[in-house]
Amino acid sequence: MTHVDTAGSGTATRWGRAAVVLITMSVFGPYLAGGIRTEQVAVYGAAVLLCALGLWSRVSLTTAGGVVVALHLAVVGVATIGVVFPPLNPTLHSVGSLTGGYDSLLLPLAVVLVLAMLVGSGANPAALLRSVCIVTVWAMAANTVVAIYSISSNSTTVLALFRLFGEGESVADRAERMGRYSGIFNQPAEAGLLYSVALLAAIYLYRDHIPKFTVSVAALTIGGTLSVSKIFLLVGAPIALAQILLVPGRRRRMWSLALTAVSVGLLTQLDVLERWDGRDFLLRLLPGAGQGDQVTLYTAGRFGEHSSLNEVVGAAFDISPMTGAGVRGLQLPYDNGWVEALVIAGVIGVVLHTALLAALFVGWLHGRSARPESVLAGGLVLAVVGASFGLPAITANRCATIVWLLLGLLLVVARPAAATTWWQRPGEGRHRVPPAVAPRLVGAGRRP
């Protein structure tokens, strides 16, 4: 991407970096008064402020980004039908919160809007992307420290400020009784997705810096393992391992893997980790170690015999199969992106959700190049699609904001007056470069 080296451009980049750093850090903040999350204040506040400054007129999206935003808006529209014309609810399940439902759907749009206004005003998207990645990597590394500390101490009172506003037992509290420690996150699945995203970001940032690579990847691997999240173990970690193995340079690749393995091994010898009671739960996931249906085991009962999703799917079809129960949803755990779409927007929502994920993949496929950003984007899309089988990855609290910050900068937001991603080199045909899984693509160090 070509930037005019002017004071205005530099100023826009500095303010843009400050904005995305603030938003990224807010994801790891506590609940505030009235059950409001820190990230809600940061994202909506930034969107309102930038719109008030008139930057809304500078918004520019890629072709794929325009399709993604249109599909997401269509989901919002279909889900709103259930608000304007509430369907009969013959089930025994109560509807959810109207504000909570709209927040889940509108927050991703607000994140994309903020990014588009920042880039449209002259901020360098490469600098913004790097800032988001740095904060995400080291914040999740810090979350690993919190998770380790939780093993040997009773930190429930403090962590409740981050996990669940108000009284009651959180999902994380119940998970910890099984030895699954997710730090500040309310669900191991949320932690697993963000550890996966942070791992991909660490590879992108430190692929040529072995010390930082080793420390960050080791910390993130331990944190993801302590959460015993299938999203991390079965989706994020394999994708990250594949990218590490494809780093060019045999010696550098072997050093990176060896140092990371040694670091993980040494850290697991800490006295506190030796007392980790989730080891048995983790070992059950090894092939042949678990009893009963392996599909049920690997998906935590979401799929396989006696699927936990059957009740939710049945309730959605009983209420309104085509348009769903509306944006309020039902007070049931969805545990799946497509199931959430079915509940709030019916079969139409499922089709739109699938099309949105496909649009992200096609957007990456058409814009892939020999740049490391292409590898990050491809891994991120695969992680989001895989994670969607275990939670609503593009709308879930906290992790959705990080996901859309990265997806927005990589695939959705365009250069001013352009319809392509900023990291796609002009003049290079999309079919002249093989898919971004070839070894030489991962290590391409050219910067915009």
Please annotate each region the language model reported:
Residues 15-31, 47-116, 382-388:
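N-terminal hydrophobic segments of proteins, predominantly signal-anchor/transmembrane helices
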Residues 18-26, 364-391, 402, 409-411:
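Loop-to-helix entry and N-terminal half of a specific, functionally important transmembrane alpha helix
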Residues 281-283, 289-348, 364-369:
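Long extracytoplasmic/lumenal interhelical loops at the membrane interface
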Residues 209-210, 237, 241-244, 250, ...:
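Hydrophobic transmembrane alpha-helices and their immediate junctions
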Residues 152-154, 247-293, 315:
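A membrane-periplasm/extracellular boundary helix in multi-pass inner-membrane enzymes
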Residues 130-161, 173-177, 182-228, 233-245:
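Alpha-helical transmembrane segments of multi-pass inner-membrane proteins
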Residues 379-387, 393-443, 448:
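Transmembrane alpha-helices of multi-pass inner-membrane enzymes
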Residues 15-19, 67-75, 115-162:
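Interfacial loop-to-transmembrane-helix boundary motif in multi-pass membrane proteins
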